[in-house]
Amino acid sequence: MTQQTLYTVTVYSENQVGLLNQISIIFTRRQLNIESLSVSGSAIEGVHKFTITTYSDRETMEKLVKQIEKRIDVLRAFFYTDDEIIFQEVALYKVPTDKLLDDRSIEDLIRKHNARILEVNRTYTVIEKSGHPDETQSLFEELSRYDVMQFVRSGRVAITKSTVEHVSIFLSLIHISEPTRLDVI
């Protein structure tokens, strides 16, 4: 069996209904589990960015990205290892307010983990932590002894360490070489 590495796939596309389903089918056909997913607008007007993490090997990732790029609404797709990108996720923790008021060590945990309090009411307090998955998980484990009422973690958001977004170069080359539907972007 080949070595499995966590890869981050970024897909740049036009904002079209059903594209997420088409992309997830490609992952399913290759028997790849999506570990995290986030979709938003990108720095380029009219272009959306999908950020997807999955465990796989390099050869499978190359094939996956080529297959994703065959979709008509996909502009470009790339894959990266963790050392090629800067990434974060956001986690929210809901803990009982009375535990926070009765035990000062929760405040110390919040400071230690560089987390922040988003909301406090009589019943619960919501704490936010951004960081890598191991950091958000570590805070969850430490808060667990205080009866975490709810815990949720976002999908990964990532940018490359490159000085320019790779899709920008691609779009400028297309714009120069031939007029396409992208000219309206």
Identify the residue ranges that each predicted region occupies.
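Short amphipathic alpha-helices in soluble, non-transmembrane regions
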Residues: 23-25, 63-71, 105-111, 139-144
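Single conserved hydrophobic/aromatic residue that forms the stacking wall/gate
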Residues: 174-185
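Short glycine-/aliphatic-rich beta-strand segments at the starts of folded cytosolic domains
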Residues: 5-13, 49-50, 85-97
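Long, charge-patterned amphipathic alpha-helical coiled-coil/hairpin "stalk" segments used as oligomerization
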Residues: 82-126
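Short, charge-patterned binding micro-sites
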Residues: 34-56, 81-87
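Helix-adjacent hinge/juxtasegments
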Residues: 57-97
